[in-house]
From Swiss-Prot:
Entries under Gene3D superfamilies matching the protein: EF-hand
Residues covered by the EF-hand domain: 1-35, 35-70
Coiled coil: none
Intrachain S-S bonds: none
InterPro entries in alphabetical order: EF-hand-dom_pair, EF_Hand_1_Ca_BS, EF_hand_dom, EF_hand_pair_protein_CML-like
Keywords: Allergen, Calcium, Metal-binding, Repeat
Free-text tissue specificity from the UniProt record: Specifically expressed in pollen.
Domain of life from the UniProt record: Eukaryota
Listed name of the protein: Polcalcin Phl p 7
Record has Hydrolase as a keyword: no
Gene this chain is encoded by: P7
UniProt key word Repeat: yes
Subunit structure: Monomer.
Organism of derivation: Phleum pratense (Common timothy)
Alphabetized SUPFAM superfamilies for the sequence: EF-hand
Length: 78
């Protein structure tokens, strides 16, 4: 599962800067299906625990560990 999380993080982090921006999260979630701007904002607020406007790898791992069922579904797509 750790390899899957790293692979998914890198797919979401399209510019390779080591963090996922709001626009990168939006693009990734669109791949998974229709997601409203409000849903993306809520998800970003939930995952971005330090409030810097980006999801770093540690925040991503924490979210994955708290939502294993969701991450299994995401791993199938990415």
């Amino acid at each position: 599962m750790a390899d899957d999380m790293e692979r998914i993080f890198k797919r979401f982090d399209t510019n390779g800067d080591g963090k996922i921006s709001l626009s990168e999260l939006t693009d990734a979630l669109r791949t998974l299906g229709s997601t409203s701007a409000d849903e993306v904002q809520r998800m970003m607020a939930e995952i971005d625990t330090d409030g810097d406007g980006f999801i770093d790898f540690n925040e991503f791992i924490s979210f994955c560990n708290a939502n294993p069922g969701l991450m299994k579904d995401v791993a199938k797509v990415f």
